[in-house]
């Protein structure tokens, strides 16, 4: 009999709600009962009112249960958790949850589906396809595709990403940098944290493509120190990507170089502003620079 796949998020919000305790209780109870279970720690779908959210793989799809406490595990197993059976904590198929059913997720497309540090999972769900295609294009062509797509940043008043990339590509300079501002200083805003913890390879791939487009060979991910889990996940992801050849002196055997480094922020709100962030990355006090020039 093959092991049943059970997914419990490793996202810091889920962990704060008791996900680690639920995972330990499930493993212990299943071992005691002789039940074959493959426990997978996935990213979070962002349904924090249901965390810890336990998902069970069935023939029909993933069935959701939540919020689950460690003390609920014996009763859930008695009720047929591993078969996706009905229970008071059950919500049916995850994709049919009202909050998710009408969504078309783009940046969060893999959230809750893949394991954050699994290169195989990432590639199986479309990962690295964009980078491989970008390596077949000229830098000008990459920028033009971004312009034609109308891609805009999630912050920065929806400034067109292609315009920013084109400006950097055309700027003179022997050394250019790509910087990800993940300081996320606005209270209650956790979309950056979810991306860093839940889909770090997506960020790595995007920054590498940006580096190819503008001629940058070095990148920094600036993460606030209040996000220790995000720092840890991102650091591990960079190491794995480098080991697999997606970062380093010869990206995917293309001859192009791009390296990434995590820099921890001190938690100053002002460092969410781009020039203050650059000051901080350079080891200086995080204060806003006079403009121009603009970074």
Q: What are the functions of these language-model segments?
A:
Residues 1-295:
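Feature of Fe-S/electron-transfer and energy-metabolism proteins
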């Amino acid at each position: 009999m093959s092991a049943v796949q059970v997914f419990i998020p490793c996202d810091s919000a889920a962990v704060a709600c008791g996900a680690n305790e639920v995972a330990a209780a499930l493993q212990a109870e299943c071992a005691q009962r002789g039940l074959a279970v493959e426990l997978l720690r996935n990213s979070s779908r962002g349904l924090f009112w249901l965390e810890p959210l336990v998902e069970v793989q069935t023939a029909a799809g993933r069935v959701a249960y939540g919020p689950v406490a460690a003390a609920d595990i014996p009763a859930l197993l008695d009720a047929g958790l591993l078969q996706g059976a009905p229970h008071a904590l059950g919500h049916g198929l995850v994709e049919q949850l009202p909050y998710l059913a009408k969504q078309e997720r783009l940046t969060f497309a893999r959230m809750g589906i893949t394991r954050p540090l699994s290169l195989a999972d990432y590639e199986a769900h479309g990962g690295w396809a964009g980078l491989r295609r970008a390596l077949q294009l000229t830098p000008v062509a990459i920028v033009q595709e971004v312009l034609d797509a109308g891609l805009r940043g999630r912050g920065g008043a929806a400034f067109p990403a292609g315009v920013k990339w084109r400006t950097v590509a055309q700027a003179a300079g022997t050394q250019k940098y790509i910087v990800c501002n993940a300081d996320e200083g606005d209270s209650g805003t956790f979309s950056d944290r979810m991306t860093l913890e839940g889909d770090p390879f997506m960020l790595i791939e995007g920054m590498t493509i940006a580096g190819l487009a503008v001629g940058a060979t070095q990148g920094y991910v600036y993460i606030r120190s209040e996000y220790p889990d995000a720092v840890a996940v991102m650091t591990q992801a960079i190491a794995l990507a480098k080991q697999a050849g997606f970062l380093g002196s010869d990206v995917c055997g293309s001859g192009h170089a791009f390296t990434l480094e995590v820099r921890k922020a001190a938690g100053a709100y002002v460092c969410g502003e781009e020039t203050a962030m650059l000051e901080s990355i350079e080891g200086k006090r995080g204060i806003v620079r006079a403009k121009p020039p603009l970074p």
